[in-house]
Amino acid sequence: MKKSQLTVLILTLLLGSQLSAQVQDDADVRKFVGDMVAKHGFEESQLLSMFRQAKVSDTILEAISRPAEAKPWYQYRPIFIQDERIRLGREFLEQHRDILLDAEKQYGVPPEIITAIIGVETRYGKNAGSYKVIDALVTLGFKYPKRGKFFLSELEQFLLLTREQNMDPQTVKGSYAGAMGIPQFISSSYRNFAVDFDKDGRIDIWNNPADAIGSVANYFSEHGWLNGKDVVARAQVKGDGFKQLLDKKLEPELTLDQLSEYGVSAVTEHQPEMKAKLLSYQLEQGEELWLGFTNFYVITRYNHSAMYAMAVYQLADAIAGAKADEVVKLDE
């Protein structure tokens, strides 16, 4: 092959790879653009220009394929229940105590729960994400078939959000999954649940802890948080009947009275009519069993993972007082 031919081939391959990393000419993109124009009155030329700038990211596709929730509990738990994160949580709670108490008064959600959510999500705002949200949602919406429908819906919500809030969609940063700000709200959550908690005339969950705190509390309240009620209880079992209750469902469906028919009971005393879900967490050897009540289910509405919700609960418990090595030891 002549040098000139090789050069042309290399340039062609490079150009092809660049074009393949963009999506503006994709038929699905053009359908999406058409829908946004028809449904929401967007300008076609502006959307096409935006997509010309958007990039499909292999890094994002790799990141979403290996979430922390894929780890077993005994490996997942130490990521969040460790001294440094607990210390930072106590500092955050103390620094924003008045705002957190105001949020509790208005929404009924304890300060330590709000703090723990923010601690798990962004290490108290220290790691809110450096990905362009538009790139994340374009990548996952058009190039991740497993959850493409969901991320296309979030892309729609993101474009509506940036128009409503007068944001430049090219400058908004977030996680590899398109979650944004101190509390890591996805676009639909921002539009539905974010609040201007300090009443300064704008909602800013990136730089304003008050709005982040109020938004988390509002999210929990709107999803059914029960003020003053327990989140979980340790479970004890007799026989093997309990095993048929262990599945991937998260919502409590059986009362404690009904659970007792399967040999399941709470270690601590609770009202027999309370509904609970039996949960299993993998240890290095064996498992530990818990009962998740309505408030536990509410936490899973923030992230649909039983491990995530337990990490939030245990981090909140630690922030509220217990030391890291005292928070429900794995070998109990």
Regions found by a protein language model. Name each.
Residues 1-7:
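Bacterial N-terminal signal peptides that target proteins for export
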Residues 8-17:
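Bacterial N-terminal signal peptides
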Residues 22-104:
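An acidic, Gly/Ser/Thr/Pro-rich helix-cap/linker signature
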Residues 47-69, 118-122, 132-135, 234-242:
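Acidic helix-start/capping segments at beta-turn-to-alpha-helix junctions
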Residues 55, 121-125, 179, 238, ...:
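Solvent-exposed loop/turn segments at secondary-structure junctions
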Residues 78-215, 221:
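Acidic/His-rich structured neighborhood in mature extracellular/periplasmic domains
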Residues 169, 173-284:
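Flexible, glycine-rich surface segments
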Residues 276-332:
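C-terminal functional modules
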